[in-house]
């Protein structure tokens, strides 16, 4: 088949080239070793404590290396998008002093913009067109019913489930057949024509987990959905390349996607960033069996079950942002507490985070320890700083306390002295402003 002719048939209005994009989004002029990291949430309005943890690590790695930390919004799924969701994300992270160098906000540099995936449709289509010209992408008209039939055959044959090899029937269409289907208005997606083979593996060295070997990707995954919007896998590859990301911090649930992502970068001619897969934050749960015996087991913090899974919980309770980040850093690096004990006059900004010292298995979230860390942190605040932070919290969460603090500051300051000092000794009784 003439792949150039096919690409023009599918993308007649796309005249830009990948070379144009390379010129539009040049390599960043940064010091050697500088990390370009990102936080790339969906604008659902909800932020999990695990998201805050990942953002803290990503920002820390960028800042300690003289790099860039930016915000990218993955808003291609409009059904899940919440009005003001982007502002909620930015405000949440700003409250924890985790600001961005770039992103979809006023005052940001714009050379690598737009920072919302919904505004980058043409960029993705340019890249898919190039893949099609090179024989690595094709239009697929397979219906949902036909996909179900393929799955049933695979289950009966007890082979891998998916769209690949002999089961990727869309690969076999001729140019004339494709032309006829387009003329008939049949809907289609654009798929990757994977060169992967069964039995082959890829070897990956994760900076947290070490050497990992996985099967090569052989699935013809969807690159563009029927509405022309990219899937997550393809969009992330294109965006990370043209935003010049060189370090990606993500949850270990994405580890299985590494072979596909590696393949996408290679076929597009992009340099693969370094991926580090962090373990989820866990919770110890106690269950009782029918005989009355208690059993402990770890599970992930759940948005549905655990109020402490939401970042908003810590804001509502009045934990200082410094306390939460301090505690998360003790989870992130096993040597942080020892470093902190020897450097009481310094903050986490002075600490050098090491991916090699991050836990490879899920760390337990301990509310008791968070409270202890927070009591210690608050004990270092001056009374004036306590007042300012209490007022900022109370303005949003405690109307009566805010009124008292604004109408009679002198009396309010005396109450701070009562719980903060015992003679000349600093007390450590308060761990959050709601106390």
Which positions does each model-derived feature cover?
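Second-shell loop/turn segments in exported
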Residues: 78, 115, 248-250, 311-314
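Acidic, glycine-rich active-site loops and adjacent beta-strand->loop/helix elements
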Residues: 73-79, 252-254, 279-282, 370
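Active-site cores that bind ATP or allylic diphosphates and position pyrophosphate for catalysis
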Residues: 130, 137-301, 310
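Short, histidine-centered active-site or binding-site loop motifs used for metal coordination
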Residues: 39-43, 73-75, 238, 242, ...
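A generic secondary-structure signal for well-formed alpha-helical elements
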Residues: 18, 93-100, 132-139, 151, ...
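N-terminal Rossmann-like or analogous alpha/beta NTP/dinucleotide-binding catalytic cores
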Residues: 2-156, 256-270, 323
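Catalytic adenosine-cofactor/nucleotide-binding cores of aminoacyl-tRNA synthetases and other
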Residues: 268-435
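Alpha-helix initiation and N-capping motif
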Residues: 86, 121, 125, 144-147, ...
